[in-house]
């Protein structure tokens, strides 16, 4: 820790306070995340340190780099590259009545999918994707922050400040208590973020787990074993759920063209194995008119 100096507190993340800092000898500006864990007395579990240290291997232009993992008096500090703006702040800054440029929506979505595909190939899930952990710079680059932290530290119900962790981007299999879930959870979250890029409004903004589920069901229909095999045997599925028909996705996301709506619908398929993968999504016709050679990952993909 003596290599870094804290400049200012910049926010409160899921796991603790986030500071802007600087490396004393190189001058590099960094984000310093102080991890506060539930069991403060026992210190940081070695499994968490091991898990999180593996994340230093994730090097991709659309994934925020974890530069260092440091311990100080049984506190864990994660040192990340610094970006000053997140997607939520950016969307909030767009004046009323105006929307993101459709090509920027397309570019951001493609870059998010690149970052997700890169991590999924390496067996790393995010599990808590939301606009607050998508960071942007002033050159049109978007990067995913906090990849892999959920596995290292769990996804808390409440932030350490007692603010409830948002459910708006959470996949239905997680909300229904599925004990096994995989990479499709991140694709669902990305789909809901895609809709929000287009409309500036969260697609499903529930204020409890049941309200969240019912908002999804009202839009896409209440799932059953016909559309999603074995959904009715998930721990939190109730046969008493109202049977909504759904089918109102296009009326809720008016700013997307036919290809955009088709891709969104494929990202929001209930049955996880049938949901489009990040890799498949990148080849969807929606992206045909995107110049991928200008994107930050072009150099590593050989586009």
From Swiss-Prot:
Keyword annotations: ATP-binding, Cell cycle, Cell division, Cytoplasm, Cytoskeleton, Kinase, Mitosis, Nucleotide-binding, Nucleus, Phosphoprotein, Serine/threonine-protein kinase, Transferase
Domain of life (superkingdom): Eukaryota
Gene3D superfamilies from the UniProt entry: Phosphorylase Kinase, domain 1, Transferase(Phosphotransferase) domain 1
Entry EC no(s): 2.7.11.22, 2.7.11.23
Main enzyme class: transferase
Protein kinase domain sequence ranges: 4-287
Catalytic activity annotation: L-seryl-[protein] + ATP = O-phospho-L-seryl-[protein] + ADP + H(+); L-threonyl-[protein] + ATP = O-phospho-L-threonyl-[protein] + ADP + H(+); [DNA-directed RNA polymerase] + ATP = phospho-[DNA-directed RNA polymerase] + ADP + H(+)
Predominant location category: nucleus
Sample GO molecular function, one term: cyclin-dependent protein serine/threonine kinase activity
Coiled-coil ranges per UniProt: none
Positions annotated to bind ATP: 10-18, 33
Quaternary structure annotation from Swiss-Prot or TrEMBL: Forms a stable but non-covalent complex with cyclin B in mature oocytes.
Family: Belongs to the protein kinase superfamily. CMGC Ser/Thr protein kinase family. CDC2/CDKX subfamily.
PANTHER family: CELL DIVISION PROTEIN KINASE (PTHR24056), CYCLIN-DEPENDENT KINASE 1 (PTHR24056:SF334)
Protein's recorded name: Cyclin-dependent kinase 1
Source organism of this protein record: Oryzias luzonensis (Luzon ricefish)
Gene name of the record: cdk1
């Amino acid at each position: 820790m003596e290599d870094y100096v804290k400049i200012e507190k910049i926010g409160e993340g899921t796991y603790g306070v986030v500071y802007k800092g600087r490396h004393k000898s190189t001058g590099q500006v960094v984000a310093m995340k102080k991890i506060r864990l539930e069991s403060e007395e026992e210190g940081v579990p070695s499994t968490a340190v091991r898990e999180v240290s593996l994340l230093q291997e994730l090097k991709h232009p659309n994934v925020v780099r974890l530069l260092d993992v440091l311990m100080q008096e049984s506190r864990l500090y994660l040192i990340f590259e610094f970006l000053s703006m997140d997607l939520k702040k950016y969307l909030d800054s767009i004046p009323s009545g105006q929307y993101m440029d459709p090509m920027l929506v397309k570019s951001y979505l493609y870059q998010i999918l690149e970052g997700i595909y890169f991590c999924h190939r390496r067996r790393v899930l995010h599990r808590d994707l939301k606009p607050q952990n998508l960071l942007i710079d002033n050159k049109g680059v978007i990067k995913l922050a906090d990849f892999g932290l959920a596995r290292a530290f769990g996804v808390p119900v409440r932030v350490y400040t007692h603010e409830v962790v948002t459910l708006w981007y959470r996949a239905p299999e997680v909300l229904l208590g599925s004990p096994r879930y995989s990479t499709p959870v991140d694709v669902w979250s990305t789909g809901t973020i895609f809709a929000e890029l287009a409309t500036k409004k969260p697609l499903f903004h529930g204020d409890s787990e049941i309200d969240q589920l019912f908002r999804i069901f009202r839009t896409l229909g209440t799932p059953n074993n016909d559309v999603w095999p074995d959904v009715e045997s998930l721990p939190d599925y109730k046969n008493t759920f109202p049977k909504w028909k759904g089918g109102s996705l296009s009326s809720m996301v008016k700013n997307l063209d036919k290809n955009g709506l088709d891709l969104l619908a494929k990202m929001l398929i209930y049955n996880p194995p049938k949901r489009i993968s990040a890799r498949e999504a990148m080849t969807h016709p929606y992206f045909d008119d995107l110049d991928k050679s200008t994107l930050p990952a072009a150099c590593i993909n050989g586009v």
